[in-house]
Amino acid sequence: MNRLLNEKVEEFKKGVLKAGWFIEKMFRNSISSLVERNESLAREVIADEEVVDQMEVEIQEKAMEVLGLFSPIGKPLLTVTAGIRVAELIENIADKCHDIAKNVLELMEEPPLKPLEDIPAMANQTSEMLKFALRMFADVNVEKSFEVCRMDSKVDDLYEKVREELLLYMMESPKYVKRALLLLEIAGNIEIIADYATNIVEVSVYMVQGEAYKCYHDELLLFKKSGGVLFESSD
C-alpha cells in the first residue's frame, strides 16, 4: 500500500513539474515576443494558456484520485496539497503570460517607444526565480529558499525604475501614453509573476517543514501570529 501510494504521489508530482517546465517556456516566449516584436510567438503564448488550463484540471483530478484512494497523511499529504497550490500558481502565471502577449500585439501596431533594457532585465531575474522555485519543489531541498526573497526584491527595484521612466515619457507627450502604459502593464505582470515564483518557494518550504514562511522584503521569515483569525491556535 505504501509503495503504491508513493508511486502515485511521485507520478502526481512529476505532472506538476511538467506544467512548471511548460510555464517556464511560456514565460520566456512571452518576453522574446516583446524583445523581437514577434507576432507569431505572441500568438503561440496566447494559445498556450488553454494548454495550461487543461494541465491544471488534470493535476486536480490526479490529486483527488490520490486523496480519495489512499487518504494519505504526513509527507505524502503535504506533497499533494502543496502540488495543488503550485498548480494554481502555475495557472496564474499562464494568465499573466497571456496578458503580456496581448500587450505585445498592441505594441506592434506602433513603432518602439524606446530601447528595452530594464524590462528584459526584470524578465531574466524572474525567469531565474521560476527555475529556482521549481527546483525547490522538485528536490524537496529548501536550504537556500531565502535567496528567492533577495531575487524578488531586485525585481521590485527594477519595476520601480521602469515605472518612473515610463511616467516621464507619458508626461513628455500624449503620443507616448498608450505605448508607455502597455510597457508599464507588461512590467507589472512580470513583477506579479516574480511574486508567484516566491509563493511557489513558500509552498515548498511548508511542504518540507510543515510551517508557513513568507518573504518580507529580502528575508524569509516564519509567518506566525498569536492566536488565530478563523480558527483558534492549536499551540
UniProtKB/Swiss-Prot annotation:
One of its GO terms (cellular component) is cytoplasm. GO terms for molecular function: protein homodimerization activity. One of its GO terms (biological process) is phosphate ion transport. The keyword Ligase does not apply. Its main location: cytoplasm. It comes from the Bacteria. Keywords: Cytoplasm, Phosphate transport, Transport. The keyword Cytoplasm applies. It is found in: Cytoplasm. Gene3D superfamilies: Phosphate transport system protein phou homolog 2, domain 2. Plays a role in the regulation of phosphate uptake. Homodimer. Belongs to the PhoU family. NCBIfam families: phoU_full. This is Phosphate-specific transport system accessory protein PhoU homolog 2. The gene is phoU2.
